[in-house]
Every structure is written in C-alpha cells, then in structure tokens.
Amino acid sequence: MSPAEIPVEAWLLFAAPVAAILFGFFILRPTKPEWTHIPILISCAIVTACAFALAARVYTGHSFDVNVWRWAAVGKWAVDFGLRVDGPGTAVLSMVALVGSLIHVYAAGYMKGDPGFSRFFLVFHLFFLAMIGLLTANNYVQLYLFWELVGVASYLLVGFWFHKESARKAALKAFMVNRIGDFGFLIALLYILSNFKVAHFNLIYLQVAYAQQNAALPEMLPVIGLLLIWAACAKSAQFPLYFWLPDAMEGPTPTSALMHAATMVTAGVFLLVRSWPLIAVTPWLPPLVAGIGAFTAVFAAVIAATKKDLKRILAYSTVSHLGIMMLALGLGQIGLAIFHLVVHGFFKAVLFLCAGNVGHAIHQPTANVDDVGGWRKALPWTYACFLIAALSLSGIWPFAGFFSKDAILDVAWEHGGWIKWASLLIAFGSAFYISRMLFLTFHGDRPEQKGLKAHPHEAEPILVVPVFFIALGAAFAGLLAPGISRLVLYGWSGLPLGLPGLAGVLNLPGTPEIAQLTFKDALGRGCGMAALGFAAAYYLTMVDAGWDWRWRRNSPRLEAAFESDFGWKTFVMWLADRVAAGARFCGRVLDKKWWDGLIEGSADGARGLSETLAGYASGRLNDYLWWIAAAAALLMGRALR
C-alpha cells in the first residue's frame, strides 16, 4: 500500500485531534476559553468513528502497514513516519477512542468553572492524541517519541492544580520514576538499531524469526528484552517501579480515569505486545514477566484492601490488574492480555468516574471511606454503575471481567507452580477490596450517623450519562472475545504467519481460545474465590462493622507496614534521599571545588603566562634583535645536527 492509498479514516485519526488542539489554542483560548471543549469533543467523535471503521477493516483481513514519509536518515539508518493498523493496535485503539471520548464528555461537566478549563482540555486531548500515535506507530523510534509525549502530557495533568504542593510533588515523582524506565527503553532502542540496523517492527520480527530458525540470534537480544521489560514496568506501574501511580491521583478525576483506563499505564503492556517476538525467544524472559505480573497483582491487591481514599484503592487496583495482563503475556497469552486490557479499560473508567461523583457529592476532589456511607439511595445511578463495574472487576459471570480476568487466572492455574496459588489470591483479593469499597461507600452507616455533616446528591446528567454508557461496556464487553481473537490472529499486519518460528514466537495458535470458559469453570475457581471475597468483605464491613478501624487501633505496626507498602516506599524514599545527598555532594565538592578550581586555575595560569611573556615585550629594538639572533642560532644549531 502506498501513502496515497491510506484510508481517509486513518488520516483523520491524527488530523482531527491536531486541528482541534490548534484551533482551541490559537483561536478559542484567547477569545472564548469556555468553548475550548467544543472542537475537542467533535474531534473525539470523529476519532471514535474512525477507530471502529479501521477495526472493521482489520476484522475483514485488510490490515496495513505503510511508511508515510522519511523524516530522518543518518548513514545506513533511516527512520520513517508510518501507520500500522493491525489487530492488537485496533483492538486497543477502539477501546481508547470510545472510553476516552466519553471521559472527555464527563470532563466537560466535571471541570466546568475551573480557572484552568481551557488549559486542561488542550493538554487532556494531547494526552489522548499521544496514545493514538503510540498505538499506530510502525517502528520503535516513532513509538518512543509518542511514549515520551504520553509521559509529558501525564506530568502536566497530574500537576494540573500546581498551586497544591502535593500535586507538584506527585507530578515530579511520576515524571522521574518514568524517566528511569524511559532510559531503559532508550538504551534498548539504541541496541535495536545497532543489531538490526532498522527500527520497523515487521523487519525486526522477520530478522528474529530467520535468526531463530538458523540458531543465530543476536547476543544482545536478552539484554534488549530485559530493558524493554524494565521500561514497561515503569510505565505500567509494576514492581519495583509501581509506587508513582497511587500518588498520581492528585490530578482531576478525568485525568485519573483516562490514565488508568485508556492511556498511559496501558502503554507498557502494549510495548511488550509489540516486542513479544524479541522477548519470547529468550527462554527465561517470559517466566520473568509472568513472575513480575503475578507478584505485583497479589501485592497490590493486598495493599488496596487496606486503603481508605477511594482513588488510592482504585490506583492499587490498577497496579494489580496490570499485573494480571503481564501474567498473561508471560504465559504466552497475547490475546488474553489484549482482551483484558480492553475490558479493564471499561470497568476501571466507570469506577474512577463513580469515585469522582462521590467526591462531587461532598464537594471534594476525592473521598475517604470514613466520610461516606449508605449513599446507594442518594446516588442511585452512580451506585448502579459502580456495582456493575465492581462485579466485572471481580470476574463474576456473566460480566465482562469474567471472560478476560478469569480466563487468565484459569491459564495460570493450569500452568502450576506458585503462580497457580497466586491466581487464587488474585481472584479473592480483587473481589475483597472492591466489595469493601462498595459496602463502605454505598452501604452501612451514613456520615450523619458518624457525627459528620454531609448532604449527598446525584450528580448532573453530564456526569452520569457517560458513566452509564461505559458501564454497558463493563457489563457486555465479554461478548467481544471472539472478535478480538480474530483480530489478534489475523491482524498482525504484513507478517507471513507461515514463516517457521514466527507463529510459535507470537503464540498465535492459542489466541482464538481466549475466554472460552465453561459454565463449570465459571462456578468453580474464579467465581468461587470471588464469592468468598465478597462474603469476607460483607462480614468485615457490614456484620462486624467496627473491624476496619479496630484492627488499625490494635495493630499500629501492621497499619504502618501497609501504609509503607511493607517498607518498600520507605526504602525508596531512603534511596532517593541518598541519591539527592550524592547529587548535593557532587555539586558542593566536585563542581565547586574540583571543577571550578580546574577552570579558575587554568585561567590563573594563562593569566600568569601572559604576564610573564608580556615582560619580554620591552618595546626596545635592541631587545627584539637579541631575541631574533637567539632564535636564528637555535635553528641553525638544529639544522647542523
């Protein structure tokens, strides 16, 4: 396919957001800032329609990968700007477009009246555009550029309310931790260019497949895979680099919803999907990915069960579910990882937006479980949507989460080993923390019964209707399993799937089996453990209602352990202090004394030399003749030797 043959909907994916941002920035912001959201919402509608049109093309076997123009060439290396529209990309793109657009609508109501309304929408849509670019990149250099743009936009959004010190610190922490991962991605990119001489995905896949067939894999391939996993752990908040994400809740609720459901944190998982042919050929890397994912999923679920702030509970929930996606990848289930990424986008967006509505009811950016309770009647629509999303997250049949999450846990059970038992803990923990949040927020004692003043009310329609439509996806997205299987199987753009070794690397033969659980499975391990989680949460929040504060009072050390993430956050802060102290030492000793001393000493030496030489310039002709004679004598003596 030539650039002239690219479908118009592919061009509009970029043209509409860019036009909306430029029009909003140059025309509306100086004149009518309160109208900035109008062209952006129109852009969202166009992007959503185009995303589904492209997904339909791929579903019917018309995927494409085309270089649009060459924008950099250095020696033998050349990098093109291209479009890759294939199965994994369009599956995620469709969810990002739909969920992201509805979050934009929600944001129009949520941010109304904020002094930074115009600035928020421009950066928010840039965030949206960056993720579209990341999903449609056809080479590593292009993906890296959009990867960085996603990070910059998230920094601006997390620190949007920069008048708050906590927001500034959270934005800086998120940015700095992601820089650690981004550095790994950059080094991996340099190794890729050095070893493969190209950045294009397909050309790299083919080289890996041929090298594997001939037992001539590059020696640096394990290092490249490890660096890419490191980058994904930072962006997708996996242990040990997960700790930035809970603090990133300082931004407005729409930021949290878009970041957790449809953009930034899913980028790391998608990077591994794109890079799996490079990773899977090293035997010890997939088990490493699975181990990181399983451990993070259990670890974050335990922490989530102890938090009080609604958005922090959901933040640790996101960390846990990203771990489930990493677990699926490590077990070779690319289709399941993509499918759960899509389903997670629906139910996590609903949960965050419902948390925003709860905070809106008490006129706060977020809410604490101690300040709410018994609000199912005061907020009926929010409660209904939250309940649907909670059941989906827990993996209860027939909600969407069952078809994705429980399918992954079923594969993990069959895998055996410690991951088998981790899958049970994940199923139990997910149901426990989300049902605890449900019961403490919408059931139990109302705030006035606790001696607090609160007059909750349902949010305006613009804050409820988008949540309702996303909740439909959380309920019924499980029906997409066959379609996503087909996209993943037939949508690897331009790949000759019959090439020996390549199909095995991608694990394509197993992908159509995603989410095909039997009813017996539904009532078995996954739903059984989820039911136990619900029952335990109900007993500890509704029957023994004082348990949640009683264990904190009786076990302050245990509470401190949970608060510090079992000491990991304390260790990270200690390490950060040591690094900062080292930087200050370098600035004080190396920079001020040694480096400045070297520079000043060089200047003093040059000045002294010039003064010495200046002394010989007496201005008398006899002195100059003497120096000329001496120089001539030296030259003659050297010539006669």
Segments from the language model and where they lie:
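Membrane-entry segments of alpha-helical transmembrane domains in multi-pass membrane proteins
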Residues: 2-15, 34-38, 78-95, 133-146, ...
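Membrane-interface segments at the starts/ends of alpha-helical transmembrane spans
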Residues: 2-3, 213-215, 411-416, 507-524
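Alpha-helical transmembrane segments
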Residues: 20-25, 102-105, 301-303, 437, ...
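Hydrophobic core of alpha-helical transmembrane segments in multi-pass integral membrane proteins
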Residues: 18-22, 44-55, 189, 527-539
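N-terminal signal-anchor/start-transfer transmembrane helix
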Residues: 14-29, 101-102, 233, 237
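Aromatic-capped, Gly/Pro-kinked transmembrane alpha-helices
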Residues: 76, 484-524, 542-641
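Transmembrane helix-loop-helix hairpins at membrane boundaries of multipass inner-membrane proteins
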Residues: 1-9, 26-122, 196-216, 243, ...
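Hydrophobic transmembrane alpha-helices and their helix-loop junctions in integral membrane proteins
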Residues: 88, 102-143, 152-462, 466, ...
